Amino acid sequence: MCGIVGFVGEANGVKFLIDGLSSLEYRGYDSAGIAGVVNGEASVTKSVGRIKNLEALIPEGLHLELGIGHTRWATHGGVNTTNSHPHQSFNKRFILVHNGVIENFQELKERFFKGVELVSETDTEVIVQLVQVYSDRSLDTKEAFKKAVSKLQGSYALCLIDTEDKDTLYVAKNKSPLLIGLGEENKNYVGSDALAMIKYTNNFLEINDGEFVIVKKDSITIEDKEGNVVERESFSTNLNAGEIDKGIHEHYMIKEIHEQVGAMRNIISHYFDGHDVNINSEIINNVKDADRLYIIGCGTSYNAGLVGRNYFEKWAGIPTEVHLASEFAYNVPLLSKKPMFIFLSQSGETADLRAVLTKLRSVNADYKFLVLTNVDASTLSRECDYTLLLHAGVEIAVASTKAYTAQIATLSILAYEVAKQLSRQPKFDIEQELSVITSAIESILDDTKTIKDLAKNLFTERNAFYIGRGIDYYSACEAALKLKEVSYIQTEGFAGGELKHGTIALIEERTPVVALITSAKLDLNTRSNVSEVASRGANTLIITLEKLARKGDYAIPNVNEDLAPIASIVVTQLFAYYAAYTKGLDVDKPRNLAKSVTVE
């Protein structure tokens, strides 16, 4: 969940290191650091907090033609400069950055450094000290690095500098994302993802698990575990460096909420040809022929999967289960005879999903996997059989907004076409209905002042609740997640009918309770739940469709009830943003969170 960068070339790499880390700050922002070689000696600068804190400490005029950098999300050891990366060997010769978790680092400490006090509390320091151990046994740097890596169990993306070799980065990878960026004019780059390097290159090399890479300014050498040189074609991405800019917006989160209109239009443009759905027929056939679908995701993606299940079961008649990736790999349910697996991951790097993929491939190599992701060059898009891109554009704020609505929209298109192929096509035109949804989102975004005022008046307490029934219950879960992660208000999403079974005991005077009602048949039932909590002092609000609205409700334009979660959730996203903004919180980077969860 950390981010790493590296540079080697005939130029000063300091600006790239800072730019790259800034682009990776969504992965972790407890601390940061850069290091390189100056006059044959290590130059290391580290700080606690954001990249701007690090930048302020960098010596004026620092020139690095070989450098590495790291932004940290703490997994081993407290948040301080001692534990922040880069880490150095005892003799100061070797410097290392690492993303991942070394599962056997305590065992390695006992075996190699018993009685020796290491500098930090991290698992990473053990690696760089191991490199020195093997270097002291007369191995050259490449072999010492390989030997050290061979002792590791767990996940890692590593980038090593030898201060006695100012022309080389040593790189290794296992179960943690890492790319090589091919520069021009004798410059090459390393980064946790393409976003870190997109301002400098859009030409990348994939690194597979177990491979080692020697990166020089004018050459890249990839070796497999046996030391054989591997030839590999480079690739480019659909990333646009301009998307990284906040533009007129104060935060990425509000920018990305507003970008949902454009994202919906992109989805419609990419997945429809005329009025026909434009999705690879192999994907359609694999989903259509499955006897059960397994949608798997984490956090917001899991919530999107809950909505998607409704489409596959209601429209296509295919039994569908939704599972948390973090549980699935270690508690695999009884699988059907002909399953199809659908992964949801904004980044395409989610470690828990990769663990599920590995587990299921070991069960049956013939299983088929589809991933819905926002990043075309991601690990999961390369490792799964099929990919459907979300076409939502770069999402940088830790709290996902436009990727969530894009996931639901894409799932709805897929389910609709599968239903059509099974002669169960719903009695509406989904392209037309998604266009109506897009207009509804635009209308909601035109009313942000009202929504901002509602948020200020509603979310004044320490606890809050969202409730809903049917498909609105899933929206309530996502709305609650969004509010808690950015505003730090303890928020839960509940099925309206479950309030009486325990949760209503938590209702106090002025406790905010927001109900989502986008189904006519569930309108009265949910309003009854709202009355129950209001009579106990709750501060209540109903978000509903115009056709169902009563005095005091917040009404959104009428849309297809099955697809309504794509529109209604936008109101709750704005609630979350303004609740956090009003409290003066860092909306884009909530405490303790990282956007791309690359460790299990």
Description of each model-found segment:
Residues G9-G13, N39-E41, G49-R50, W73-T75, ...:
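Short, glycine-/Ser/Thr-/acidic-enriched flexible segments
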Residues N12-G13, V133-L139, K166, N186, ...:
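Short helix-capping/linker segments at secondary-structure and domain boundaries
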Residues M1-K246, E250, R265-N266, V277-D289, ...:
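Conserved short alpha-helical segments that host acidic/polar catalytic motifs at enzyme active sites
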Residues E65-T82, D273-N285, G308-R309, E313-L344, ...:
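Glycine-rich oxoanion-binding loops at beta->alpha junctions
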Residues K288-E433, R469, L516-D562, F575:
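Glycine-rich phosphate-binding loops that contact phosphosugars or nucleotide phosphates
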Residues Q260-M264, I268-Y294, Y386-P512, K583-E600:
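Active-site phosphate/pyrophosphate-binding segments
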Residues N558-E600:
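Generic C-terminus detector
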Residues L152-K187, F459-E485, A520-L522, R527:
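Acidic/histidine-rich
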